[in-house]
Amino acid sequence: MNNGVSQESSVLLDLASHVNRFAFDSFRSDNNKTLLSNFLHFNGNTRTGAAAAKRGVSLGGKVGGASVRFGNILNDFNRAVRFHCEKIPIGFASLRVGDGGDGADGNGNGEGNGVRVDECGGVENEGFRGNGVEGEKPKKVLILMSDTGGGHRASAEAIKAAFYQEFGDDYQVFVTDLWADHTPWPFNQLPRSYSFLVKHGPLWKMTYYGTAPRVVHQSNFAATGTFIAREVAKGLMKYQPDIIISVHPLMQHVPLRILRSKGLLKKIVFTTVITDLSTCHPTWFHKLVTRCYCPTTDVAQRALKAGLQQSQIKIFGLPVRPSFVKPVQPKDELRRELGMDEDLPAVLLMGGGEGMGPIEATARALGDSLYDENIGAPVGQILVICGRNKKLANKLSSINWKVPVQVKGFVTKMEECMGACDCIITKAGPGTIAEAQIRGLPIILNDYIAGQEAGNVPYVVENGCGKFSKSPKDIAKIVAEWFGPKAYELQQMSQNALRLARPDAVFKIVHDLHELVRQRSYLPEYSCTA
């Protein structure tokens, strides 16, 4: 593990090389820290005017092995934060983004009320004026996401498609990666950092669980906001949104703080659409949202414990692409279109958008288990989705299989692939689970990401719509039994999956949003032209 981290050519190593170019003469970096984990800890009071705020960030936890190198990198970044804040005091202080103090009531009626960002990023005090006219132009929806895993973008695109399908040109919907598109380096490297951390499980677990305590992630956002508030404000305001939808746990805190300081919380509908089915990072929940759309009752209970009111919470399900709601073609027709055998039962083997996981080993095991040596014929077939992994697709296509096997790359009509099959093997991604339930597919989970996907395993297993195993041989045995002596179990799990399915979730979400924005009598007027 240590060698893997030391040899990884990643954004984090690039981060170290950049921050070491700074000249420091007063801040000491130690290997032994006493705080909880690798979080940014904000310390110091916000001051405006000539007295600039001094802030620092700390890396906590006593770590060893591969994590020591990771810790040293963030220690160097810690020094960069202190240096940058002392020399270039920008961000919340210069934007006058307060926390509701100094007479503020949380809606901009206090210090910081009425500020705006001009095209050059400067601050003006003319405020955001309601135009006094009912909305005649298309209303604008801004969806905040990040490409940290495929599920956030998939949910964003599903919501966008549902708005267009239900309301046509009445809404203009924009999808933006807030961190990648509207924050400076190194914060715009978030997707790359996530990919690195997920590949190294212990580092990801340290990050996920270490930032879970409220005191930790609030300090993190406070320090981070020092650098990104100006850019984020410009990014938000240039879209002039009537509705802002966050489909990512890191897209609530800084935008909401900016909107509150500008007095826009009652003018712009800000909502969160949670894309995790069970285990949720606490950063998903913020008390200032207009709505928090939860996919399950378990997530709704977590929202209540986080301090949200019942009136803020709606349990509609996980938004999936509207195409999954359309009538399903018969299996034999779909199989014929996909080049599959029309009569044999089929298993769908997926590895996500990047074709990750033990796909080849599982496919080979299935090839053996689905061939009956006694009759010399296959008892099932395999549809493999390799995503963008062309090397894997080519390798699987070159194998001389004993059973019918169809190998696909990146597909856009997943509803057809699922509709052609009788069960699915996949990692515990929430979007794939929700889509499989809509199609009534029993699910075999073969892996999960620690933290946000860990709860999806008991969600599937305990609700009787699937099983979990990391062993390719055990998985192949389960499928062979489902296609043979345990066909009754396959049928029961299919019914359980359909019972949990919420195919209309995305439509309920957009209609509720439409009603919320309709209740707003005035539309805000913006001045940022950046």
From Swiss-Prot:
Extent of the transit peptide: 1-105
UniProt entry keywords in alphabetical sequence: Chloroplast, Glycosyltransferase, Membrane, Plastid, Transferase, Transit peptide
Reaction(s) this enzyme catalyzes, per UniProt: a 1,2-diacyl-sn-glycerol + UDP-alpha-D-galactose = a 1,2-diacyl-3-O-(beta-D-galactosyl)-sn-glycerol + UDP + H(+)
Main localisation: plastid
Residues annotated as transmembrane: none
Gene Ontology CC: chloroplast membrane
SUPFAM superfamilies: UDP-Glycosyltransferase/glycogen phosphorylase
MF annotations from Gene Ontology: 1,2-diacylglycerol 3-beta-galactosyltransferase activity
Enzyme class, spelled out: transferase
One GO process term, biological-process aspect: glycolipid biosynthetic process
Subcellular location: Plastid, Chloroplast membrane
UniProt keyword rRNA processing, yes or no: no
Enzyme nomenclature, EC number: 2.4.1.46
Coiled-coil regions listed in the entry: none
InterPro entries named in the record: Diacylglyc_glucosyltr_N (IPR009695), Glyco_trans_28_C (IPR007235), Glycosyltransf_28_UgtP (IPR050519)
Lineage: superkingdom: Eukaryota
Family affiliation: Belongs to the glycosyltransferase 28 family.
Role of this protein: Involved in the synthesis of the major structural component of photosynthetic membranes.
Protein name as it appears in the record: Probable monogalactosyldiacylglycerol synthase, chloroplastic
Organism of provenance: Glycine max (Soybean)
Gene: MGD A
